[in-house]
């Protein structure tokens, strides 16, 4: 799951720039 914020979170394994 990617964060809509575009930052890396502990909940999200996917990081989008």
UniProtKB/Swiss-Prot annotation:
Disulfide bonds join 2-14, 3-12, 8-15. Its main location: secreted. GO terms for cellular component: extracellular region. Keywords: Disulfide bond, Secreted, Toxin. Expressed by the venom duct. GO terms for molecular function: toxin activity. It is found in: Secreted. The cysteine framework is III (CC-C-C-CC). Belongs to the conotoxin M superfamily. This is Conotoxin ar3c. It comes from Conus araneosus (Cobweb cone).
